[in-house]
From Swiss-Prot:
Reported function: Part of the Tol-Pal system, which plays a role in outer membrane invagination during cell division and is important for maintaining outer membrane integrity.
Domain of life: Bacteria
Record note on quaternary structure: The Tol-Pal system is composed of five core proteins: the inner membrane proteins TolA, TolQ and TolR, the periplasmic protein TolB and the outer membrane protein Pal. They form a network linking the inner and outer membranes and the peptidoglycan layer.
Keyword rRNA-binding: no
The name this protein goes by in its record: Tol-Pal system protein TolB
Gene behind the chain: tolB
């Protein structure tokens, strides 16, 4: 794979990046199962009154907890248990559950539904609190409520904010039709933000989670757009001469870094989120591309072949005029696609190793880097909002799929179950506001 193909102008090779796939519409079911050798045993009883609902809340909760790989679901039986019931801690502990969830769903006079639940620690024999959530009686509303409950459980028991109530974006190709899809974190409720007969690549979430920047070829060249999800409105932010690619948001959402071939070689520029104030940030005779802001907004990580082969560098967010770019990756001779974890401590990237491309994670303080996959065609890493997982694209069984892996490499990657179509270019959205 040449430098031009892998890195220089991703826009020119979109057809290669999202070429494979079948004809069926894809529904992604995120299956992060078996992650981690130690799992927290928890029993989630059926909620009272949920049996007649179009979507049972507890099935979403159990599915989320299982997919996280951090929990094992203990059979709670089929009898619903309300949050108001007295809890026999010893009985649940005897079943092997260190935590227990009880709840109910009740219809309000206005047609909405109130979902109440309480989480219990069966070891300490105490309540860990709960929530009272209002939702609509439809699949989307009940699933979102289930994700919120799972997030509460994850944070209370593990001390880390959950990412179940977040969203994914990815590109699906079905035949000659491309779709930019927005889905729940488990792949359900997928909605097309854009459908096109031309390639779509490089979706990137805004920090607010309300916008997605991406590259579309609908004007017969790569152009950067922003799509406002609540309104459905979209607009061009970069349609300069040559290629416009690799958009990346600043942490405040006011600026995007983009890669443009405006003067010949691809260089990195910044532009406001309204498409004004274009400013060049790199000035090299090499290819500089794939920018990504550090979470504190002080740095931009990017890929460049200025040293003879593609490596990841870091420069001040104001550009090289404010300080020389410094090389960051030294493991291997070919490293691309930088992504920094939300806490700024880790760098995920793709490294060419043994003729293949693997997902690596580097500790930015120590410089230690390790492969967290054993596959050979990994691409497009994206951290979860809590930094616990990395979503990425890979090849499996001759087709393109998505996969997730713990960012600490504590367990093997798990393929996300995809039915039909080619799924590429994943991006994990931020925490919901």
């Amino acid at each position: 794979m040449s430098l031009m193909t892998k890195l220089g102008f991703r826009a020119l090779v979109a057809s290669c990046l999202i070429a494979a796939g079948g004809a069926a519409h894809a529904q992604v079911n995120v299956l992060i199962t078996g992650v981690g050798s130690t799992q927290f045993p928890i029993a989630t009883a059926n909620f009272v009154n949920e049996a007649s609902l179009p979507q049972q809340v507890t099935s979403v909760v159990r599915g989320d907890l299982a997919r996280s790989g951090k929990f094992s679901n203990v059979d709670a039986g089929s009898t619903p248990v309300p949050e108001t019931a007295s809890v026999d801690f010893g009985a649940w502990k005897a079943k092997g559950a260190n935590a227990f969830v009880a709840g109910s769903v009740n219809r309000e006079p206005n047609g909405q539904y109130k979902v109440n639940f309480i989480l219990y620690d069966t070891v300490k024999q105490q309540s860990l609190g709960g929530l009272s959530l209002t939702t609509s009686n439809d699949n989307e509303g009940m699933r979102k409520t289930g994700h919120k409950i799972a997030d509460y459980i994850y944070q209370k028991l593990l001390g880390v904010r959950g990412v179940f109530n977040t969203r994914l974006s990815y590109v699906q190709r079905t035949g000659n039709v491309y779709k930019l899809l927005i889905s729940d974190s488990d792949g359900q409720n997928a909605i097309p933000a854009l459908t096109s007969k031309e390639p779509i690549i490089s979706p990137a979430w805004s920090p607010s989670g309300t916008k997605v920047a991406y590259v579309s070829f609908e004007l017969r060249k790569p152009v950067v757009y922003i799509h406002d999800l609540p309104t459905g409105r979209r607009y061009v932010i970069s349609n300069q001469k040559g290629n416009n690619s690799a958009p990346a948001w600043s942490p405040d959402g006011q600026t995007l870094a983009v890669a443009l071939s405006l003067t010949g070689n691809t260089q990195i520029y910044s532009v406001s989120s309204t498409g004004t104030g274009l400013r060049r940030l790199t000035r090299s005779s090499s290819i500089d591309t794939e920018p990504f802001y550090s979470p504190d907004g002080k740095w931009i990580y990017f890929t460049s072949d200025r040293g003879g082969a593609p490596q990841i560098y870091r420069m001040p967010a104001e550009g090289e005029s404010a300080g020389a770019a410094q090389r960051v990756t030294f493991t291997g001779s070919y490293n691309t696609s930088p992504r920094v974890s939300p806490d700024g401590k880790l760098l995920a990237y793709i490294s060419r190793t043994g003729g293949g491309f693997k997902l690596y994670v580097q500790d930015l303080q120590s410089g230690a880097a390790n492969a967290v996959t054993n596959t050979t065609r990994d691409e497009s890493p994206s951290f979860a909002a809590n930094g616990q997982y990395i979503l990425y694209a890979r090849q499996s069984g001759g087709r393109s799929v998505l996969a997730a892996v713990p960012s600490d490499g504590s367990a093997p990657p798990q393929i996300l179950s995809v039915q039909g179509g080619a799924i590429r270019e994943p991006s994990w959205g931020p925490f919901m506001q």
